[in-house]
């Protein structure tokens, strides 16, 4: 058996880091088991689904390093779903209902008042052909419900009916079908809700493992019933915990702030995003994996907590810094060249500055510092200005090396009596225009004598 998984986003918005957790969990599981990963767009809602969102999802996944083995669009598979609908109708497992939303709400409230479970009472099963024809003559169109197998012979005499599965994350799970309403699979306009196309596609595409958020746990009992009704063996299920904001709110496509695209535009490394999306809320320590192979070594569905995990942007910042601080020059080189940072001093420049980067794009600023003019003149007080002028008069001749900074500052200390912060801070401001940054012993060599002299206030 070839392990086959799928990620099935709805292209009705941009995916966020919570969706990323699901996509990466599936992709890593397939990778570790020499399996296949299917990207399947749940675009049956033709009004809300947009091609621009589908394209954005593909770009986001590619940026994260997730490359599907197969791409499918549910909107192109309606004929297959129609055949499944007819099969269920023929078996007497899909029945027409005509209630409006208001009528269903009144019935729900009535059941609650009688202290009955607020589930659909299957009233539509009692309709005669004449009553159905009369309702349709009024202009009503039916929606179609799946008849859950929670009874023996009388569908109005429901009884506890347990569905069991061994969840890859949560262990043994049980849901009671008697506590649920028969799910609507087909809307009045003939379009399909999520449940039916999902099951039909999983069967048709040979999906063996379904890994998704734990907000789908209850759905699983229904879907297992539909798998069996269509004559298929249900796949293995795994439900990971969900990510929330730091305040505990659920993530949503509508918020946008934590969309993968916005994180990319903010300059985060893809492996910082991937590492946090996978390792947060697990028993594993949250560290920055340098690549997908390393992340796969830490990926274990059994290590996932059953409680939701809070996404803290500060953790993402820390992981991003860690990746940049540990990134070897050979890995950074193509990206540096794309920014015009090349030549004989490119490697020594990277080694000098990468330990101070928050974002990779910060290198452009430091390259300007060592290779061009300062973005703006440093703000030095009169006393510090005089001190820096004196210090620059003591600059040693070239050639310079890693010891030049030490020998120069020792000479300045002897000549001026300044030491510590009072000595180093004015020199740093004059040389770089910044109060903080990479080691000046490394930067000074890169700036060079002539450019350093040009920065004499």
Swiss-Prot record:
An example of a Gene Ontology cellular component annotation for this protein is: cytoplasm
Which keywords describe this protein according to UniProt?
Aminoacyl-tRNA synthetase, ATP-binding, Cytoplasm, Ligase, Nucleotide-binding, Protein biosynthesis
Catalytic activity as recorded in UniProt: tRNA(Glu) + L-glutamate + ATP = L-glutamyl-tRNA(Glu) + AMP + diphosphate
One GO BP on record is: glutamyl-tRNA aminoacylation
Q: Does the keyword Isomerase apply?
A: no
Respond yes or no to whether keyword ATP-binding is given for this record. yes
Where found? Cytoplasm
- Summarize the protein's role: Catalyzes the attachment of glutamate to tRNA(Glu) in a two-step reaction: glutamate is first activated by ATP to form Glu-AMP and then transferred to the acceptor end of tRNA(Glu).
Q: How does it assemble?
A: Monomer.
Kindly provide the name given to this protein in its UniProt entry: Glutamate--tRNA ligase 2
Query: Which organism does this sequence originate in?
Result: Brucella melitensis biotype 1 (strain ATCC 23456 / CCUG 17765 / NCTC 10094 / 16M)
Gene (UniProt): gltX2
């Amino acid at each position: 058996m070839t392990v086959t998984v799928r990620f099935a986003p709805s292209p009705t918005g941009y995916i966020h880091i919570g969706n990323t957790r699901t996509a990466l969990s599936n992709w890593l599981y397939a990778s570790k088991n020499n399996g296949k990963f299917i990207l399947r767009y749940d675009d049956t809602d033709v009004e809300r689904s947009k091609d621009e969102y589908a394209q954005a999802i593909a770009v986001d996944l590619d940026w994260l390093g997730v490359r599907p083995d197969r791409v499918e669009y549910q909107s192109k598979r309606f004929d297959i779903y129609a055949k499944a609908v007819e099969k269920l109708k023929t078996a007497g497992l899909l029945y027409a209902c005509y209630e409006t939303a208001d009528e269903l709400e009144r019935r729900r409230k009535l059941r609650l008042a009688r202290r009955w479970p607020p589930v659909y009472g299957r009233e539509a099963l009692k309709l005669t052909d004449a009553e159905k024809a009369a309702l349709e003559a009024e202009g009503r169109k039916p929606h179609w419900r799946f008849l859950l197998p929670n009874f023996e012979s009388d569908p109005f005499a429901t009884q506890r009916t347990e569905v069991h599965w061994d969840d890859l994350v949560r262990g043994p799970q049980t849901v009671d079908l008697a506590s649920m309403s028969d799910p609507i699979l087909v809307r009045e306009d003939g379009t399909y809700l999520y449940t039916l196309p999902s099951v039909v596609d999983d069967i048709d595409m040979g999906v063996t493992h379904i890994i998704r958020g734990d907000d789908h746990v209850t759905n699983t009992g229904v879907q297992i019933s539909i798998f069996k009704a269509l004559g298929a063996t249900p796949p293995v299920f795994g439900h990971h915990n969900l990510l929330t904001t730091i305040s505990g709110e659920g993530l949503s496509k509508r918020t946008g702030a934590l969309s993968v695209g916005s994180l990319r535009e903010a300059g985060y490394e893809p492996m910082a995003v991937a590492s946090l999306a996978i390792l947060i809320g697990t028993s594993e320590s949250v560290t920055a994996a340098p690549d997908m192979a390393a992340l796969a070594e830490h990926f274990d569905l059994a290590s996932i907590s059953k409680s939701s995990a809070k996404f803290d942007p500060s953790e993402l910042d820390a992981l991003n810094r860690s990746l940049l601080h540990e990134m070897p020059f050979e890995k950074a080189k193509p990206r540096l060249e794309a920014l015009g940072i090349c030549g004989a001093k490119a490697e020594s420049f990277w080694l000098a500055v990468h330990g101070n980067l928050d974002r990779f794009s910060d290198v452009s600023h430091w390259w300007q510092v060592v290779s061009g003019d300062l973005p703006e003149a440093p703000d030095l007080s009169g006393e510090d200005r005089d001190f820096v002028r004196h210090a620059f008069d003591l600059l040693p001749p070239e050639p310079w090396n890693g010891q030049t900074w030490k020998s120069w500052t020792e000479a300045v200390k002897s000549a001026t009596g300044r030491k510590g912060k009072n000595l180093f801070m004015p020199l740093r401001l004059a040389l770089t225009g910044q109060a903080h940054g990479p080691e000046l012993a490394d930067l000074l060599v890169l700036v060079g004598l002539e450019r350093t002299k040009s920065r004499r206030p």
